[in-house]
């Protein structure tokens, strides 16, 4: 929805999640839209042929390359960055080993090794802090 607003296909909205499926269909020339529960379901529906096309995160296509065709990658200037934040929380029930292991995991996530793993699964790690 945000990409369609930014591309000028839909009118600006304070909350793009409130843009109806009907509005999107009309902006796309009246195509039938099947809104699935989440992007994983959309990806599966396209892969099995229940839907002809779908809009999903690139990372959700991993492992389905032989069953789907990527028609277009929408640029970040239309969508904005998709950020998956991580933080270590204060947990009074965690012992010292659990707390230090959690910190090690968070520290690992910002290493080059972790970036390589994320990139393997189609996550873009070229974002600004």
Kindly label every feature range from the protein language model.
Residues 1-129:
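Exported/periplasmic ABC-transporter solute-binding proteins
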């Amino acid at each position: 929805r945000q990409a369609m607003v930014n591309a000028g296909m839909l009118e600006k909205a304070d909350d793009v999640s409130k843009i109806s499926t009907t509005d999107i269909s009309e902006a796309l020339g009246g195509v039938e839209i099947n809104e699935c529960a989440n992007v994983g379901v959309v990806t599966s529906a396209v892969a099995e042929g229940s839907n002809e096309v779908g809009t999903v995160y690139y990372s959700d296509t991993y492992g389905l390359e032989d069953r789907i065709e990527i028609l277009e990658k929408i640029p970040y200037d239309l969508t904005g960055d998709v950020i998956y934040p991580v933080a270590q929380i204060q947990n009074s029930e965690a012992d010292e080993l659990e707390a230090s292991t959690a910190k090690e995991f968070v520290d690992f996530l910002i290493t080059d090794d972790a970036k390589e793993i994320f990139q393997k699964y189609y996550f873009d790690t070229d974002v600004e802090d």
